[in-house]
Every structure is written in structure tokens, then in C-alpha cells.
Amino acid sequence: MASLQDIQRRISSTKKTRQITSAMQMVSTAKLSQIQRYGRGYQAYAARLEAVVEHLVAAHLFDNADAKHIPLIAQRPIRKTGILVVTSDRGLVGSYNANVIKQTNALMARLNLDTTNTAILAVGGNGADFYKKRGFEVILEHRGVSDVPSFNEIRSVVKTVTSLYESEVFDALHVVYNHFVNRLTSEYRDVQLLPLTGDTLVAMGGTEAHKAELDIQSAYEVEPDTTAVLNVVLPQFAQSLVYEAVLDAKTAEHAASSTAMKAATDNAKDLIGRLELQFNRARQAAITTEITEITGGMAALE
């Protein structure tokens, strides 16, 4: 049985741990509130940009013969697939990273991907480290994403991604991440980003029926020409999709961290209660033993 001093030391160390996890929970909760406010502001821009592209799809600009030669739209044989994996840089986020990696591995299995035909682009250290150790080619690694990432911060990543795609380093790109649902729940998402197609809009929440309602080809006169318009709009759309994914994933990360730290704080509280009960019982047993010994000694003197 542990001594009273050992139990006291465990109680003291557990209380210190509880203070740390409680502070980390409050910090994560504050970051979550901050990024949610920021995200709501960005959604206004993203919704307008998506509406513009949605109308271009409905106007059949993507089907234009000239448009098919634009690098971000052009279809080509898929020899190598790029996967942009969004994870966190550190742990203490529950099953957040494990879920992304598990589902990404399942995606690779469905697409028959392995180390020979897959290029990993990692936003976050956990994903980069995991796939490096397993022999995958990590062609892009971006660590140290801000708690509330700015658009400019992610724009450099997207420019690198699109440049690699246009250089035919890979022939298709999937973006995989955890989508924030609420403070307790996130769900895995996989969006095929490149080549950009009308189907990308369906994956992002649009529907074929909705696109049919927008069949407004005759309402558009494109100036100066289709290629010029799409060359401006499509890179912005790609940047927006990736930024939304990173912002969404970062929101889910803060929520996961807050939930994990709350669970750790609650567990520490329960452990302290059990240790204090154990301490009281041990102290009571020690006092009882001491009284018995004193009583026995007095009886022997009589």
C-alpha cells in the first residue's frame, strides 16, 4: 500500500496537471470563439465567389472549347494523385489527427494509391511526419499555421499547389480535412479540387437541380473572352476552397483541443477525489494502528 507521503505527492502533481489542462481548455475555447467570428466574416466573400463560379458553370463556360485548355480545368490522364492533408502541428487534440489520417488511408485504398503514384502535400506537422515515415513523397510541407490563419498566409500554399499541378507533378488533387460541425463533433471531408469541374460545386454543397435552375447561358456576354475571365476567377476560386478547408480544419482543431482538455481536467478531478479518499483511509488506518499500539502498550504496563 502506498504511503501517505506518496499519496500526497500524487494529489499535488495531479492538481498541478488539472490547473494546466484547465488553462489550456480556456485558451482553446477562446481561440475557437475567435476563429468562428472570423470564419463567419469570410463566409460572405466565399459565398459570393462560389455564386459567381456557379453561374459560370450554369452558363456552360466550363464546356467552352477554349476553356478546356486552361490548366486548372484541363483533363489529362492521372498518373500521380496529389493529396493535400490538413492536420495539426501538435497533439492534445483527441482523435482529430488520427481520424484524418485513418480516412485518408481509406481514400488511398479506394483509389489504389501507394507510394509510387501519390504525392502528399501537408498542411500541419502530424500529417507530414506520418507519411514521411511510411515512405510517401511529401512535396509540400507547411507547418506553423496560425491559430486564426489569414488568407494571405494560405495563398502562398495554394500558389505552390497550383504551380505544381500546372507543371504536371501530379494530375489530380484531393483536399482532406476535418469539417467542424459543433464543439463536440467534426466529420472527415474529401474534396477533389483539381482539375476544377462543375462537379466540384456539387461536392461543396451545390446540387444538379440547383444548377439546372441557373441554366442562363443566354444571359451572359463574356468580355473580353471566356479564357480571360476564367483565368482570373478560377485561381481565386481554388484559393478560396483551400482557405475554407484550412479555416474549417483549424476550427475543428480548436474544438477538439477544448474537448480533450475538458476531458483531461474532468479526469484529473476524478483522480484527485479517489486519491483523497485513499489518503483519508490510509490516514485513518494509520491512526487506528497507532491507537491500538498505544492501548496495547498501556495494557502491558498494567
UniProtKB/Swiss-Prot annotation:
Protein origin, superkingdom: Bacteria
Topology class, membrane: Peripheral membrane protein
Coiled coil: none
GO biological process, one term: proton motive force-driven plasma membrane ATP synthesis
Recorded GO CC terms: plasma membrane; proton-transporting ATP synthase complex
Keywords in alphabetical order: ATP synthesis, Cell membrane, CF(1), Hydrogen ion transport, Ion transport, Membrane, Transport
GO molecular function: ATP binding; proton-transporting ATP synthase activity, rotational mechanism
Pfam families given in the database record: ATP-synt (PF00231)
Annotated localization: Cell membrane
Record's keyword annotation contains Ion transport: yes
PANTHER family (UniProt xref): ATP SYNTHASE GAMMA CHAIN, ATP SYNTHASE SUBUNIT GAMMA, MITOCHONDRIAL
Its biological purpose: Produces ATP from ADP in the presence of a proton gradient across the membrane. The gamma chain is believed to be important in regulating ATPase activity and the flow of protons through the CF(0) complex.
Subunit structure: F-type ATPases have 2 components, CF(1) - the catalytic core - and CF(0) - the membrane proton channel. CF(1) has five subunits: alpha(3), beta(3), gamma(1), delta(1), epsilon(1). CF(0) has three main subunits: a, b and c.
Family according to the record: Belongs to the ATPase gamma chain family.
Protein name: ATP synthase gamma chain
Gene that specifies this protein: atpG
